[in-house]
Amino acid sequence: YQNAQKKHKNNIILSRYAGPGSHRYPLGFSGDSVISWASLDFQPYFTSTASNIGYTWWSHDIGGHMQGYKDAELSLRWLQFGVFSPINRLHSSKSEFTSKEPWHFDAVIEQSMIDFLQLRHQLIPYLYSANLITASEGRALVEPLYYEYPMEEEAYQHRNQYLLGEQLMVAPITEKMNSLLQMGSVEVWFPEGTWYDFFNGQPYDGKVSLKVYREITEMPVFAKAGAIIPLDKNPLKKEEITSERKYFLEPMVSIFY
């Protein structure tokens, strides 16, 4: 870290967990994860609870790193979760069966991956603001529900559900879809108040747990009534990116009320 500081102003160090205090310098990651649904199901809990020891900039190998088998649905669900994680990092061992780039999948999966990656770009203003709060105030970027609702039993029971920044509640789908319904599902606890689907604005009453169903190209993310989400209005498309073009943001805001 000190050597990197001498050469460059902004640096990234990626490291495994190395004991208490090791969160101060690097981005952490959860190790070489196996490509499986069981592994994905563990990652949201692992990511949010890393904040318990100060490791708020925590990442995971999106899609899994090794072993397992090629599973397009698993890869897309993991990428969706990655878009709403502190660090969005596709990674795998060198193999034609484990590659996670969108162009390695069929048209439906590829386009959905592209849409979610462009959404990640749109979220930069929101994530940047949340990261500033993390850096200046020490508030975790990702929090287990019990940080905000410590007296609610449900906050401890829904281990894969978490808060991203101050405005978004995320509930990744981590199980295979129902073959009959052709939808994935996850049980979501809605704390007190009114919550809105981040993508379509559908309202949900609070103080209730519901099984929420989503098609393979959709993901459960919610904003509480009154939330203001700053977004980039026009994320760059791949054909617009050139070595000469400077990176820019054109802001917009989503308001949930």
Explain the meaning of each model-derived region.
Residues Y1-K224, D232:
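Catalytic-domain carbohydrate-binding cleft regions of carbohydrate-active enzymes
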Residues E218-Y257:
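Accessory, solvent-exposed terminal regions and/or long lumenal/extracellular loops of proteins
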